[in-house]
Amino acid sequence: MKEVTVQELKEKIENDDDFFLLDVREMSEYLVSNLDGEHIPLGELDARIKEIEDKKDQEVIIMCRSGNRSGRACQFLGGKGFNNVANLRGGITAWAKEIDPSIPVA
């Protein structure tokens, strides 16, 4: 599975690269802190996949709290024809630790 580090994600954001950020945490976690990505909880991804089908050929970076749920989402979307998915290594926990310590993690 392809992974992206939080430093690489930060560079993509700063460079205004063309990618799609998908946050698969629960709503309660997303409301505490987020990086402005599209929010679809992992448990709803199958039912809501039509919302993101237009991203199949775009780079999709998937995040969660630590990288476990996003890893499962990467495998799921890869099996549904998404050609360029990557897991954010360490999730928002790594972002808070390495990029922005002011971000709370739920």
List each model region and its residues:
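Rhodanese-like catalytic fold shared by cysteine-dependent sulfurtransferases
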Residues: 1-20, 24-59, 69-106
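Short, surface-exposed ligand- or partner-binding patches at beta-edge/loop junctions that are enriched
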Residues: 63
